[in-house]
Each structure stands twice: as C-alpha cells, then as structure tokens.
Amino acid sequence: MRHLLYATRQTYETAILIKEAALLPSEIERNYIDPITISGYSKENLIVFTLDYQPNNKAPVGHCKAYLLGQLLPALKKLGTKFIYCADSNYFKVLTKNTKAEAQLGYVLPCAIDGYTDMKVILGVNYQALTYNPNQADKLNLSIGTLTSQLSGQYKALGSDIIKWASYPKTEAEIEKAFAEIMTWDEIAVDTETFSLHPLKAGLGTIAFSKDITGGFGFQCDLIQQEGENVRIFNTMFRHRLRKFFEEYNGKVIWHRAAYDLKVMIYNLYMADPLDNAGLLEGLEVFTKNLDDTLLIAYLATNSTAGNELGLKTLAHEFAGHWAKDDISNILAIPLPELLQYNVVDTMSTMYVKNKYYPIMVRDGQKRIYQEQFLPSLKTIIQIELSGLPLIPDKVKEARKELENGMFAAIQLMRGTKFVKAAERVIQQRAMEAANAKLKTKQHPIEHFSHMQLNPGSNQQVAILLYEVMKLPIIERTKTKQPSAAADTIDKLIYHAKTQESKALLQALIDYNKVAKILSSFIPAFEAAFDKGNGRAYLHGNFNLGGTLSGRLSSSDPNLQNLPSGSKFGKLVKKCFAAPHGWIFAGADFNALEDRINALLTQDPNKIKVFTDGYDPHSMRTYAYWPEKFKHLPNTVEGINRIQEEFKTERSDSKPVSFALQYLGTWMTLVKNCGFSPEESKRIEDNFHKLYEVSGKWVKGKIEQATKDGYGTGAFGLRIRTPLLAKSVLGSSKTLREAEAEGRSLGNAISGQSYGLLTNRAVNEFMQRVWASKFRNDIIPVALIHDAIYVLIRNNPAAVKFANDNLIECMAWKGLPEIADPRVPLPANLDLYWPNWATPITLENNLSEDEIKQAVTAALEARKAA
C-alpha cells in the first residue's frame, strides 16, 4: 500500500484512492492536488493511497473487500479521514454498495461498510482515462468540483435545485392557458412518457414542454390517477388539443431521440389504424417541419474513435444528476406527480444538451451535414419504422422448425466424431473431480457422470474441445485471457484444421452457432411482430442515426444488419418476408458501393481497372497474391479472369485475405484468420501492398494528417475525432497500440464505410419525389440494410416503373467532388421479391411498363421451366 504525503501530521481529512499504476506524483498534483488547493483547501490535509489489483489487472468484489477491510479502511480510520475521493469504479461500488458507479458521479455518498459509515465517498476519475478519451475531462472536473464543494460546506446534490418553476395543468381552462403561453415561445423542448417502447403500443402517458433549463409544463394525456393508482385511459379531448397545438406552432421543436417520440406522436394523433399511410404522412409533415434532435446534435459534436454516450441522462448528468433511479419501464408504477416532474426534467435536460452541444457542432463544421443529411434521414426513418417489414407468421413457424432440425443435425454430427467423444470424457472427468473434492469419504465413480454431453453453447466446454482435444492454435483470447471459443473465432479456426474430420466438425460448430444466433436473436422478434390484420405481421425495428463511428446506420430490436444472407440459413429467413396482397416487396442494393467509393477516393489505378477494364476483382487479387501459381496465365483481362472458372479454390482462398488486408490488417491477421504460415502471410501482404500501392499511400496520408488535426473527415464532411492519434507519432516504438487501432478505425471509415451515407441520401431524395407524386400512398419505405433500400410498392405497373426509374437515378448520384470521376459509376438494379424476399426478379434500368410486365412474366416462366 503506497502513499503520497504533502505534510507529516497525525491526521489527514481527505484521502485520494487510485490504482498504483497511476501513482505518478507530478500527474497526481496536476490533476487532483492543484485543482483542490485552488479552491482554498490546504494540501496538507490530503493523502493519496494506492488501490490493490490482482496480477491480471482485475479487482473483483471479494478482492476489493479484503483490501479495504484488511488494510486501507483501518488505516484511514486511524488517520481521522472523513472524505474519500475514489478514482476507481470497482472500489467505489464496494465502498458505497452501489451496482452502478457512473450514475453517482457528482454525488457525496456515505460509506456503506459497517464501522466506517461516518466517512463520505465521492466517485472520482482516474486521470489516465483522459489519454484514451478526452471527454472524460468533464467528468474529472465534475468529480473534483463535488469534492471541493463538500470540503467548503457548499455541496448540493446534482439536480436538487434545477426546477425554478413548473406547472401541471389539469382543467380544460388551465390546459388552454398553458398552451397559449407555450405558443408564444420561440423554441420548445418536448418529451413524452409512454406505456411501451413499441411505437404502436406506446400510447401517450404524459408530455412535457420547456423553453429553457429553468422549468416547464407537464400534462397528463392517457394517464389519470384513481384512488391513488395510475390508470391508462384514452383521452380524446387532450389528444385533439395536442394535435391542434403542433399544427399551429411554427417555432423550433426540440426532441432527444426524435425517431421514437415522433413515431408515438404520429401514430397516436394521426393514424386511424396501423396501415394508415395517409395519416402517417400528414403527421410526418407536421412534426418534421421545424425540429432539432439533440441526440444527433450530440453525436455530431462528439463522434470519436474513443466512443461517445448519447443517452439523455448521460449527456445531461452534470446538469440534472441522476434524476431517475432507473430507466422507467412501467409508468403505471410511478406516482403521477413524480412522473410529471420527471418528464419536465427531461425537457429541461434536452434544452441543456442543445445549449451545450449545438455550438460545438457548429464550431466543428457539422451543421451542414446535420441539416442536409441527418434531419432528412430522420424524416425518412420515421416512416420506415412506423411502416415495418411484412412477415408471414406461418413461414416463421416453418423456419423455426427447420432451424431446430438443423441445430439437432449439427449436434448429432459433432457427437459422432472422436474429438467430441474425447472432449466429453474430459468434461465428465472434471465434473467428477469437482464433485468428489466436496466429499470427505464417499467418492463418485466416473460412471455417475456419463450422462454429461458436450454443450455447443458453452464456451468453456467448446474451448476444451478446440484447444485441449483438437490441439488447435490459440489465436484469440477473452477479456479474462482465456482461449476464445466465440463464434467468430471458430470461423477463423477452420482455416487451421488439418484433416477433413476436424474441418467437418468445425463446420458443424459454425452451422450450430449461426442457427443458434437466428433462433435467439431473430425468430423471437419475428414471432412478436405486430399483426395488422391483412395477413401479415410487421417487424418494427430501429434504424439508428448516430450509432456508428462512420455515420452508417446501425440497427436494433432486432439488428437487421446481422440478418444472415448468402447461405442456406439466409434464404430460410428471407422466405418469411413477403408483401401483403396487392403489394410487391422490392429493393435495390448498390453494386459494390464500398469498393467503388474506395477506387474513386484513392484513384488507385488497379482498383479503377476493375470497373473500366472488366477485371474480376477476386481473380485480380488472387493473381497478385500467388503469382507463382499463375505464371502460365497471360497478364491480361482475359487471362486473369480465367481464374474465376479454372481456379475456384484459390479464388475462394483470396476472399478472407482481401477482407483482412482491405481493413488494414497485417500478415499476422492472415496467420490468425486464414491459417497461412508467417512466411506465406508476409509474401501475400507484400503483394497486396504492391498491387494497391496508391490506395495504401492515400490511407496512410489521411491517418498521418489526423495526427496533426486530431480528426479525419468522412462522407459529407462528417468529422471523426481521433484523440489518440492527435497525441501520437505513428511508426515509432512508443506508439500506443490503441493509437494504431484508432488509425485502422479511421482509415476504414474514411476510405469507404462513411459513404454508406449515400444510401441515406438516395432514399431521402427518392422519398421526396414519392411524397410529391401521385404514388405517395403506393410506395412505402420499409428498411435500410447495409447499402440496400427496401420498399413496398402497390401492385401497379406505373408505380413499379416510377420506383425503377427514380430510385435507381437517386442511387446513381455522384454530387460529391471526391467521387465525381465518371469512369466509376454507382449502379443499382431494382429487385421485385416474388413470392418472397428469397426469390428476386431483377429489373433492368429504365424499363417501360410493358417491358416490366414482360420481364416479370419471363422470369416466372423461367422458374417453372427450371
């Protein structure tokens, strides 16, 4: 237990606790002692102690308790310590018996350990965290401010006095008077409390409005109190008044995570039923005419390789504190006055977040992308998420049954191998030893454990199979340094298998993992889809703006970006999706968008050749990686493209190589992911960099520029902050490993990934055309997955032609200077999925209505003949 003193005395009123690795006197003084003493507190009252960690750099609860009770707390008691600044979340949670440390930042808590409850504990921040994430500086300053306010006797709990005024109108007259006042405000923050996270089940419990950070109005809607309990009702009068207000109000309306609240508002105030697209569009126009979304503002102000937190409570914590003990999951269980106050604090906090982050967004040049890309995308996404993806419930049942059969078959195949039988003997032996270790005399024989079989879902048991029995190399480890048995690790290990039996076993494990993922992540969501009474149930997932570093959409509930595709499992899942009667499910996917964008950005001649000269890209790379194998082939388009048919194995082997190296992997990645020897891996990496020398220099230059600027720039000017690169000299022996990883993340984002925003831009322009056309209720967007746009089109040749002409034209847009080179276009084709998503009919561009009919007829006849 090491310590630092600033005077020799009998007592020290305040102790700072920190990991031993951070006990650097100059840094302790700069980050803690100096800021504390500036407030007038004498540093002679301060002492710094180290916190003990295990050799593996872990501090589990038991270890923390033993160190605190055995050494540290008795020492602090003897020194008369009253205040503890604990710059370690693990120890803080033990000291205060809190399960979540972050929420307690800015608060003074009593020590919860018996015998030491007279001590006060403040959660601190380890200054070393600032190296990896400069945003932690705000939290460090907040924690120091909390300590100094406590030491000076001026401490007030965060959020305890932020409400300067609040009003909760109940009568019709009070409600009218309140709305009349709100109507005079130039801008308002609005927030709802609802009964469910599902937009079609949420209802409107309460709603609040604020014009600034001092207070606001809170209104009951579909929630009343009867005999002391909350009761859900349908408040027609208030809903009518609410709709009237939003139609008449012309000021700025500010939401946090508007995609959710606006879905709820539109569905409840405008849609007569779940299929009412006309009502949806009417409400969409009202609610998107003049809005801000503080989640998007905060994202653009903080987007960084260090990550960011975009929840309202986190962003406004320094203002409002931990104003709700937990996220509200059931508003019926919360006293109505408390719920209304909570709702008002939400709107005040929304205003606080805008006031803090909007100027940063503008300063960093992100206002244009916010207004021209993110807000239009928000409007489109609201219609997408309210419309949903149509599913056939009976097909979902069939898929579950087939998947369960596939899982059973994979398990049976595994259990028939010598490797699994050997692994089961190890599992049984260890179970016997563990059981017998608890017994004093009687011992269980191994036969008592013969029923135990390998559980493919147990990482611990699969690790025994992979590494102890099959003797496969350990290519990845878990956070606890154990050999990894994760699904993506097994995907790589198959390249290290030496025999057909071991490869077959690993393939069965891969199949098992894929099926298990579908059964756990997708099928339950499909089964819970919303039945709209037209023969289809609809999947209402989330497409999240601001969910990735590159600006591309993420997806959740479920993550549709992870839908299996291109395999037997992908086809099985896609059979579940089909349009309702009278409609066509359709989609258009950019053709190799990321590869085309990379060629355009880098102007690498060997990447551009693929699109100008007709090279098969996989054959070109195969030829470059293993030139010794193809000396007999002429170095021409025709010669190299022969690899596509004549050397399918080598071409297939090139794909994981290309994937690894295109995303800035190294020869070591190839050893791990592909099973090549170090020597071969080095040759392949060298050949890759020779092939793509120009693009390699381009990416390197962008990363080096980020070390000077502290950020890189993606599509449409998206800023990607790189705090570690800003402090690093790349390529030196002292370069942080994390800085190199940050460089890879930046390189991947700016060299292609961020241009996934072109998908957003295309669908936004397309929907503007649809909304302005006679087809506004005949073409409905339903999903954005990777670089593909999915829509429902009424079964009408004119509507199909409109989509085929306009969507493809919008996707072909190349209005950014860096991608304007006409040699590499951005093509796409419209697919009509009939009878379901698994069976596309691809249309050529610019077909007439008659040609569309002929193309569909020909495709269906070809299927019959096949």
Regions found by a protein language model. Give the residues of each.
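A common structural junction motif
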Residues: 692, 807-819
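Short hydrophobic/aromatic beta-strand micro-patches
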Residues: 790-794
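A polyanion-binding, active-site-adjacent surface
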Residues: 1-157
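Short hydrophobic beta-strand that contains or immediately precedes a catalytic carboxylate
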Residues: 16-18, 124, 188-190, 291-292, ...
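Conserved catalytic core of nucleic-acid polymerases
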Residues: 379-386, 407, 439, 540, ...
